[in-house]
């Protein structure tokens, strides 16, 4: 690529790889402008890379870029390759042990584009179905109570001692984690840089590792 497009914070994380390439960066909540710029530059013949954190197809920019490309006349649409990455749920799971070994659901608590009632319903159905639940965007200043509300919903279907893993800055410098329980979750430090993994009915903790059995006869 000769042009790098992305959220300023993510561009800073890969600055050592960019070298002398042209950079187009902007801030939070400017995703459409950012991706439209990338599509426009690509349509002009440039090789453009759009930077996402984690995996671009999991709450990243891959979907939006592909949607915007579809708005162009077919003959003007640039080729687009999605490069897979390592999403926070998987990075966090590796730090915690093996909590995602069975079926799991990934739910973002950000209600910028999804109604809060719909998010709560998804959490309810995931808990009722006994999925391990990986939670993205668990808390912010404007959403201080959302995680507690989700916890209360899950407690209708899980025991209070259900293991819960909390990983902060997954895959980044300063990454740290702790293993707690559903009952004690409100006491733990959780912020926007955290990923929360709530175990299922069979999840357990051994030697400091959070483990969800797959069902093998060991």
Residue ranges of each PLM-predicted region?
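Class I S-adenosyl-L-methionine
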Residues: 1-80, 186
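Structural motif
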Residues: 2-3, 21-23, 46-50, 79-81, ...
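Short, well-ordered secondary-structure micro-motifs
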Residues: 17, 61-62, 92-94, 117-119, ...
